[in-house]
A protein has these predicted regions:
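Proteins enriched for Cys/Gly/acidic motifs involved in redox and nucleic-acid/cofactor modification
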Residues: 22, 86, 100-128
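Active-site ligand-binding patch in enzyme domains
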Residues: 114-115, 124-131, 135-264, 273
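Gly/Thr-rich phosphate-binding loop signature of adenosyl cofactor/nucleotide-binding cores
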Residues: 268
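N-terminal low-complexity segments that are often proline-rich with Ser/Thr-Pro
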Residues: 283-285
Length: 285
């Protein structure tokens, strides 16, 4: 979500909500204002929140800052807000103009709207293939079938999403870090790493497990091997156990669990099987 503050036809502050749990866009914009905000207008893509969650209510911050007018792009579908933010502002003497560019804001904040309405992450599938439709060389190598620009785009995408998901086969074959090393964005954000590993085969000496203390890492499994589970947890990984679906992790249940954890978006980077499983349940994702 994005916010801009204007006073005397000048922009005096801009802000945005970077990720779940951090400053909301209104408070981010206010924190960047180096002059008096009394009497200013704030333009917001989403109705300001009015409840206590990971962050305090933005409506209170706007009142305290002396904002006189709020222009809202779209209403918040969250039942905790949904019109209550507008009501609070109006009750405190702030002029409100609502839904001035609703469709554009829906497109801009598609991840948020999907998450709020479905209580599950928005999932994007990423794949790479050769001109003749292959996802790897005839020897099974898939790491370098794309060019430098495509790999940079992948890292930029990782910055945009809350989590990245792969199958255990990718970890065994490529031993990836699954971090964000984008040079196109400042302060790149490492997504939560999720490995779908039905039988807990992820190598304990893999780069992902060894760096679990630095980057949040989740292993999703349907295995009940408590000893093996403890080894991953001792290494810093979180282990999620789902019911079994055709001898594999139940993706529907996993999406529900991840949604409850506040993970609103996932980029799925995986070889054919995990893509197939995700595609089969896509209507529910």
């Amino acid at each position: 979500m994005y916010k801009r503050q204007v006073k005397d036809d000048r922009i005096i502050g801009e802000g945005w909500h970077r990720k779940y749990g951090e400053l909301h866009a209104e408070r981010d914009a206010l924190s960047k204002c180096k002059e008096d905000t009394n009497g200013a207008t704030i333009y917001v893509t989403l109705e300001p929140c009015c409840h206590h969650g990971k962050q305090p209510p933005c409506t209170e911050a706007l009142v305290q800052a002396g904002i006189s007018r709020v222009v809202i792009g779209s209403m918040d579908p969250n039942p905790l807000v949904s019109g209550k933010g507008v009501k609070y502002l109006e009750e405190h003497g702030i002029k409100v103009e609502g839904c001035v560019c609703n469709e554009e804001c829906l497109d801009m904040n598609y991840v948020f709207f999907h998450y709020i309405r479905n209580k599950e992450p928005y999932v994007v599938m990423k794949t790479a293939q050769t001109l003749d439709g292959k996802i790897a060389t005839y020897k099974g190598f898939s790491k370098w079938i794309t060019g430098e620009q495509a790999r940079e785009n992948v890292h930029a995408d990782r910055h945009r999403y809350a989590a990245i998901m792969v199958g255990v086969g990718t970890v065994i074959a490529d031993n990836p870090m699954l971090d964000c090393r984008s040079t196109a964005v400042s302060n790149p954000h490492n997504p939560v790493r999720i490995i779908c590993d039905s039988r807990l085969r992820t190598p304990l000496d893999s780069r992902i497990v060894k760096s679990a203390g630095q980057i949040p890492t989740i292993i999703a499994t349907c295995s009940t091997d408590s000893d093996r589970k403890s080894l991953y947890e001792n290494a810093g990984c979180e282990v999620i156990i789902t019911k079994e679906s055709e001898q594999h992790v139940d993706l529907k249940e996993l999406m529900h669990i991840l949604g409850e954890k506040g993970i609103d978006s996932i980029i799925l980077e995986a070889v054919s099987y995990t893509h197939l499983r995700a595609h089969e349940t896509s209507q529910d994702l």
